[in-house]
Amino acid sequence: MANVTVIGAQWGDEGKGKLVDWLSNRADVVVRFQGGHNAGHTLVVGNQTYKLSLLPSGVVQGKLSIIGNGVVVDPWHLLKEIETLGAQGVSIGPDLLVLADNACLILPLHRDLDQAREAAATNKIGTTGRGIGPAYEDKVGRRAIRVADLHDREALEAKIDRLLAHHTPLRRGLGLPEYDGPALLAELEALAPKILPYARPAWLMLDEIVKAGSRVLFEGAQGALLDVDHGTYPYVTSSNTVAGQAAAGSGLGPKGPGYVLGIVKAYTTRVGEGPFPTELNDEVGQHLGTVGREFGTVTGRSRRCGWFDAALVRQSVALNGIAGIALTKLDVLDGLPTLKICTGYRLGDREIGYLPAGLKAQRELAPVYEEMEGWSETTQGARSWKDLPANAVKYVRRIEELIGAPVALLSTSPQRDDTILMRDPFQD
C-alpha cells in the first residue's frame, strides 16, 4: 500500500509529530490536510528539538511537504516558522514546501475575533486564540481570502471590502474598533511576493505524484475526538480531524488516504474544557502529567490526565477506519503498581460502550474500569519487543483486544529511534 494517513485517535497531543517524523523516512511526500497553527508538534532529532505548528513534519527530513487546501494558513506565522527552522539549519524553499493555492488565509482580524469571543464567553471552549475558528467560518461563508487571491490586487481589494462588511458589525458588538481595510490590503500586498513562490495547485501535484508510484504520508493535526462532527461538541476544533478529511483536505480523492494509523497514548490527556470520563485529579494524575511532561506545545497549558479509555479509542477506530495504532508514552506508566483501563461507561442504570453525542450524557458518564498489574522495570528507550517487561506486554495486548486494532508501532521515548516496529504501515 503506497499511502499512509496518520491521525490522533484521542484528544490530540498523542505524539503524532515524532511518528510522522519517523515514518517520513519511508515516505516521499508529507501532506497536512486540516487545521491551522493551533496544534503543535515537537520533534526530537539527536540533540536538536524542533517545534512545528503549521509546517508538515516532513520538512525536517528534507521531504517534499505540502500544506493542503483543508488547512487555514496564517501566512505571517508560516514565514516565521520557516525562518525559525532556517536558524536551526533546515533550509525551506519552494522546492521543498508547497502551499495549496486554494487554501484560505487566517488574517489578524480572525485572531481579534477569536480572542474577543473567548474573553467574553461565560462557558469557554478553550480556544488557542489564533483565529482558526473564525477563518473556517469565513471559508464556509464564502467570503475568505485564499492564497490565489494574492495574485490579483483589484480582486483582493473587493474581497477585503466584502470581508469587512461581515466583520465590522461583529467587531462593533464585541467592543473592537473597525478594521482598517486599506492597511490590510497593504499588508497583503507586501506579503504576496514572499508567499506566492510556494503556491501551486496541490491537488494536481498529488495526482501526478501518486500516478508516479510515490509514497504519500498524510499528517493529521489534533485528534479525532476533537472533530467538529464526531467529537465532544461544542468542545471541539473547527475542522474535521478524522481520516476521511485527508481526501477532501488534499484534493487527492477518497482512495488517497490508504492505511490509516491511529496515534494513541498509553493513557489519556486533554487540553482545555470538555468532558473527560477517566480524568484523574489525584496523585496518579499528577504523576502522568509530570513524568509525561504534559504541557501544550503551542499554548504551554497543562494537560488534564487520566487512565486509558478503550471505549473512546474503540469509537475512534470505527470512525477513522484505523488499520493499526502507534502506542506512545508507554514509559510514563513505568513504576505504577496498578493500572486501570476504561472498558465502557455507566449512564444511569445502563452500561454503554461508546461516547454518546449529547453533552449532558457525556458529563454524566461513570467509567467502568478493568485493573491490571503494573511493572517496576523501565520501558524507556526500548527498541525491541523482547526488551519490554512481561506486564507491559500484557497491557499492550489487552489494549489491542479492547479497541479491536493491532499495535503497529510502539514509542518508548521522544527520541526518533526509540520506536518498536511491529508492522510497517507502508507495506501492509
Curated annotation (Swiss-Prot):
Give the record's keywords alphabetically.
Cytoplasm, GTP-binding, Ligase, Magnesium, Metal-binding, Nucleotide-binding, Purine biosynthesis
Q: Where in the cell is it found?
A: Cytoplasm
CDD domains membership: AdSS (cd03108)
Q: For binding IMP, which residues are annotated in this chain's numbering?
A: D13, E14, G15, K16, N38, A39, G40, H41, T128, R142, Q222, T237, R301
Q: How is the cofactor bound?
A: Binds 1 Mg(2+) ion per subunit.
GO CC entries:
cytoplasm
Q: Which residues bind substrate?
A: T297, V298, T299, G300, R301, S302, R303
Binding residues annotated for Mg(2+), in chain numbering: D13, G40
Q: Which reaction does it catalyse?
A: IMP + L-aspartate + GTP = N(6)-(1,2-dicarboxyethyl)-AMP + GDP + phosphate + 2 H(+)
Q: What class of enzyme is it?
A: ligase
Do the record's keywords include Cytoplasm?
yes
Per the UniProt record, which EC number(s) apply here? Answer: 6.3.4.4
Among the GO molecular function terms of this UniProt record, one is: magnesium ion binding
Q: Return the Gene3D superfamilies for the record.
A: Adenylosuccinate Synthetase, subunit A, domain 1, Adenylosuccinate Synthetase, subunit A, domain 2, Adenylosuccinate Synthetase, subunit A, domain 3
What's this protein's family per the entry? Belongs to the adenylosuccinate synthetase family.
Subunit structure comment from the entry: Homodimer.
User: What is the protein's known function?
Assistant: Plays an important role in the de novo pathway of purine nucleotide biosynthesis. Catalyzes the first committed step in the biosynthesis of AMP from IMP.
What is the name listed in the Swiss-Prot or TrEMBL entry for this protein? Adenylosuccinate synthetase
**Taxonomic source organism:** Phenylobacterium zucineum (strain HLK1)
Upper lineage is:
Bacteria, Pseudomonadati, Pseudomonadota, Alphaproteobacteria, Caulobacterales
Whichever gene encodes this chain, its name is purA
